[in-house]
Structure formats: structure tokens, C-alpha cells
Amino acid sequence: ATLDSQNSDFYKKNAEKTLNKLDNLINKIDKSINKKASFVTFHDAYQYFEKRFGIEALGALTINTDIQPGAKQIAEIKDLVEDKNIKCIFSEPQFNPKLINMIAKSTGAETGILDPLGSSFKPGENLYFNLINDLYENLNKC
């Protein structure tokens, strides 16, 4: 706002509007997220979200999306899902859900989709809010 004083009021109003919108979203999630949800993700992409809202993925099929998980990793996740009675396994729209579906079918866990990149959302001023709300809603279904 100081670099473009002619539009200072516009920037300040936008900032205030955005911060209020963010506060409302955070308050909604804080009040109603299922902190006891048991879930596994396709890859470990949600640590900031998990830490901020007091939840934790119990595992991830892969740490690096460039490397497909091997038979050992798949077996370990399958055993984890069975041993911990994990309810949900999440895939991502950017990757083939075949392995997630296979593990879910053999364990009875439900599947869902988490989109850490927001690739399924329309670009624009609401993209971030839609992304965070979608993560919340899908995790809360768990």
C-alpha cells in the first residue's frame, strides 16, 4: 500500500476482506474437524494442514511421488491399515488410484481424494479457500 498510495485503500480493504475470510474458515475447521480421524494418504503432502488443525495421517504410501512404492511399502501400508483399523485411504487426482483402491479393497477401508495442488479448482480469488475447505471436508468424511 505504501508503494502505490493511490490504491492504498483498495489494498487495505482487500487485505481485511481476505483475512476475515481466512479467520472464518480456520474457525470453522477448528470447531468441527474430526481430530480422531484415522487415515493414510497417497503421499506425505499435508503436514502443515495436519499440524495446524491437530490431526495426523497414520501413514503415506509414498514419500516421493516420482518413485512408485514397492511391494514392501505396499504390504507395510496394508498391514498398518489392518492393524490400526484405519478407516480412510486418500488418493490424489494427479496420480493413478490403482494402488490405493487395491489396498482399500483388501482391507475394507474407504477411499477418498485429497487434492494438495488444487488442480480441480477454478483459478481465482477463492482458490486457496476452496482448496483448504476441500481438504477439511474430505478428511472430515473419514
Kindly give the residue locations of the regions a language model identified:
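Extracytoplasmic metal-acquisition and chelation regions
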Residues: 1-142
